[in-house]
């Protein structure tokens, strides 16, 4: 697998997936990178929550690799601005930009948990509508961790009407 991506876009995707990776099980401590054409899918999971981010890259060789999340995120963050190149070489991966090069070990792909396929989106919101709806209800949430049910926001949709309810 080999691709190029702008550092800032890549770091944003890695950070999103890296926030949910597991802390105890080996393979769930990794971020799965899967390249098909010019589409890179970045996946992180702790078996309860999964985050998938898809971004456009310049793809050279399709493939997939499972890399320790913390090492990958830290390595890419330290690079200067520009186009980051990631290339697999056996059980290692090279992350480079300019004269800086990191070589990281990888996990076996067979150890990564099989995730259910992502269903088609049930609703699409603009960022403005999402933020507006969220800002109307988030003040009603509790910060008391003793009652975790009240610390979140539930999103539902009504398909017939096409509105999202927060």
Task: Indicate residue ranges for each PLM-predicted region.
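Structural preference for solvent-exposed beta-strand-turn elements
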Residues: 1-163
């Amino acid at each position: 697998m080999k691709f190029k991506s702008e550092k800032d876009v890549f770091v944003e995707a890695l950070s999103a997936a890296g926030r949910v990776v597991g802390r105890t099980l080996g393979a769930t401590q990794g971020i799965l990178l899967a390249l098909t054409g010019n589409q890179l899918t970045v996946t992180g999971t702790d078996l309860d929550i999964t985050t998938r981010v898809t971004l456009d890259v310049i793809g050279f060789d399709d493939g997939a690799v499972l890399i320790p999340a913390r090492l990958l995120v830290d390595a890419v963050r330290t690079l200067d601005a520009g186009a980051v190149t990631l290339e697999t070489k056996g059980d290692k991966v090279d992350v480079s930009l300019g004269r800086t090069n990191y070589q990281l070990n990888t996990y076996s792909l067979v150890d990564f948990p099989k995730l259910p396929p992502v269903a088609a989106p049930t609703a699409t919101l603009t960022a403005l509508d999402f933020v507006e709806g969220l800002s109307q209800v988030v003040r009603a949430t509790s910060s008391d961790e003793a009652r975790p049910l009240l610390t979140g926001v539930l999103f539902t949709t009504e398909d017939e009407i096409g509105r999202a309810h927060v």
